[in-house]
UniProtKB/Swiss-Prot annotation:
Pfam families: p450. Belongs to the cytochrome P450 family. It is an enzyme of class 1 (oxidoreductase). It comes from Papaver somniferum. Heme binds at residue 476. This is Protopine 6-monooxygenase. The gene is CYP82N3. It catalyses: protopine + reduced [NADPH--hemoprotein reductase] + O2 = 6-hydroxyprotopine + oxidized [NADPH--hemoprotein reductase] + H2O + H(+).
Length: 541
């Protein structure tokens, strides 16, 4: 959190004498409670002290807890890793009103998602998600309950099952082909000096992700391409709404951390912006839903919204509105799919450009399997073992989110410690996946590790040393869809083009600060040179 900004907000905002007095009273009460609680970390049994609570980070401020530690500019996952070196793999912190258990040990994480999986099945929401994303109706944030289990069943059996993914394969590949045709056209552009124009692959990955996701969820053809070209005002408006959602949801709000001071959020205007953006997003989703209601699609051409409409009448919604249930589920699929695949593909290619040996190995594997007389197809992907290792290794070093958050409503025991109900769980995935006790040369990019000693480890949430898609009941239901898409795009790109960085320099691997997703902070500009016959880059849409 940018704590200096928070302090400036407090200093620059007029606070009434009544509010200040209430705040001082709260500080006194807080100090009394902290003094009392800090003296009861252990219990005794026949003269022996038995630790009942995990170590607590010292230096908490009244009301704000340890939020001031996030004001140094250091990335949260790195700061938490340093604290783990001091306090151990499990310790507690205070983030405003929230007591949080921070974990970075594979054994403890496994216990949380096996023995205590039901207890840690809730994902904390924020005021931003509440106002903009139907959080109480969404599979992403609705509490663990019969309604959530119904949503999960629909996602895994109706929307993202192997049969459904097979039925939409043609939609997916056709959208990918459209984007590759556009990419080929871009490679033919020259600047005023006749030199090739660099292409921002980060932006292109966003386009192809939008193309595929919007086609399979809403039936919108070439949607990402229309956004880039500005040909469709609805597409441009939608992109603007989603970009604003991403920006607003990355903000730290006092309402989430210190509810007593939540009224200060109104002075910044962010709450009004969230409400406005939520209304605009709901309006466009409702419009698309009405369009789907008025048309009929054959089973072979059904998109996800069609499927949701067809099953909603027979679904137990436990009092939730039918239209909201459909919109919330589709939006969760968008949020879980578009940004995450663009981010993952960007990191994969960035690491390959800085590790040319791995890039050449991947290309040799594809050339040997596919040759140069055709494009890579979906059916080829399962045989690209080195490509699979590259994706795993990238997700180990750069998972979609460095931190994974859950909470519990009931008391439980974790690693011998008593954890009170209401405690949040924060897993430092970044440290977990770079643990030298688990990984050889953990800071190095070595895809070969997944062909040898770590060959049996996958990313599906069953191996707790590698959790890019989460684990437990809340593991991402779209793992198979995401991997199929990423394999195809990456394989076609490596197979179809020789790639060079500008001036032969390494790619900048700096990470953007803030937000919920681990985003590369700079563009990925490369010079692409086609290496196949021109006819192979053409496509029929």
């Amino acid at each position: 959190m940018d704590f200096s900004s928070l302090l400036l907000l407090l200093l620059n905002t007029w606070i009434s004498a009544y509010s200040m007095a209430a705040l001082l009273a709260l500080v006194l009460v807080y100090n009394l409670r902290m003094t009392k609680s800090s003296s009861s970390k252990t219990t005794s049994l026949k003269g022996k002290k038995i630790i009942t609570r995990p170590p607590a980070v010292t230096g908490a401020w009244p009301v704000f807890g340890h939020l001031h530690l996030f004001g140094s500019g250091e990335h949260p996952h790195e700061m938490l890793s340093k604290l783990a070196e001091k306090y151990g793999p499990s310790f507690t912190m205070k983030f405003g009103k929230h007591t949080t258990l921070v974990v970075s040990d594979t054994r403890v994480v496994k216990e949380c998602f096996t023995t205590n999986d039901t207890l840690f099945s809730n994902r904390p929401s924020t005021i931003a998600f509440d106002l903009m994303t139907y959080a109480t109706d969404s599979i992403a944030f609705t509490p663990y309950s019969p309604y959530w289990r119904e949503l999960r069943k629909i996602s895994t059996l109706k929307l993202l099952s192997n049969n459904r993914l097979e039925s939409i394969k043609q939609l997916r590949t056709s959208e990918v082909s459209v984007c590759f045709k556009e990419l080929y056209d871009l490679t033919n552009k020259k600047n005023d000096n006749g030199a090739p124009v660099p292409i921002d692959l980060k932006r292109w990955f966003d386009e192809v992700s939008n193309n595929v996701i919007m086609r399979v969820i809403f039936g919108k053809q070439n949607f990402g391409s229309k956004i880039v070209l500005g040909e469709d005002q609805e597409a441009v408006h939608y992109k603007k709404i989603m970009d604003e959602l991403s920006r607003l949801s990355s903000l730290t709000m006092l309402s989430d951390m210190v509810p007593l001071l939540g009224w200060l959020d109104y002075f910044k205007g962010d709450l009004r912006a969230m409400k406005r953006n939520g209304k605009e997003l709901n309006s466009i989703l409702q419009k698309w839903l009405e369009e789907h209601k008025s048309k009929k699609s054959s089973d072979a051409r059904q998109d996800f919204m069609d499927v949701m409409l067809s099953i909603s009448k027979d679904t137990q919604l436990y009092g939730h509105d039918q239209d909201t249930f459909i919109k919330a589920t589709c939006l969760a699929m968008i949020m879980g799919g578009t940004n995450s695949t663009e981010v993952a593909l960007t990191w994969i290619l960035s690491l390959l450009m800085n590790n040319r040996c791995a890039l050449h190995k991947a290309r040799e594997e594809i050339d040997l399997l596919v040759g140069k007389d055709r494009q890579v197809e979906d059916s080829d992907v399962k045989n690209l073992t080195y490509m699979n290792a590259i994706i795993k290794e990238t997700m180990r070093l750069y998972p979609l989110g460095f931190l994974l958050e859950r909470d519990t409503k009931e008391d439980c025991e974790v690693s011998g410690f008593n954890i009170k109900g209401g405690t949040r769980l924060l897993i430092n995935v970044w440290k977990l996946q770079r643990d030298p006790n688990v990984w050889t040369d953990p800071m190095e990019f070595k895809p070969e590790r997944f062909l040898t000693e770590n060959a049996d480890i996958d990313v599906g949430g069953q191996h707790f040393e590698l959790l890019p898609f989460g684990a437990g009941r809340r593991v991402c239901p779209g793992v198979s869809f995401a991997l199929q898409f990423m394999h195809l795009v990456l394989a076609r790109l490596i197979h179809g083009y020789d790639m060079e960085t500008l001036n032969g320099e390494d790619v900048d691997l700096s990470v953007s600060s803030g937000g919920h997703v681990n985003i590369k902070s700079t563009p990925l500009e490369l010079i692409l040179t086609p290496r196949l016959h021109p006819e192979l880059y053409d496509c029929e849409t």
